[in-house]
Amino acid sequence: MEGEDGGMNRSIDRQAELRRMEEACRQTRHQLDMIEHQIIRRMTALIPSLGRRKYGYRRGRPPEPEAFLTRYRSNLAAITAQRQPEIDALARKLMRQQSAIAALQETIP
């Protein structure tokens, strides 16, 4: 009987640990999502200023459609680069958490 109770307690402990690990993993994913949303918000705020240029029909030339996209991509790359170390660290943490969760799930009957 003692052996069964010990095994059952360990199984319950592992399940509780698994729930804690899954919650930590969800929080890490949430942090990554928050960074993505912050980048999107910054880019959305920049769009009006990216479209405004003194060049265009007023100077006798039509506006270049690719110019806006070039400015947009350049700003997106710069904003993302500022957050890249944090994004990379969270991505590595998420991979470690997912691996640990998978390993623990294999030990739970």
Predicted features and spans:
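Short, Lys/Arg-enriched N-terminal segments with co-localized hydrophobic residues
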Residues: M1-G7
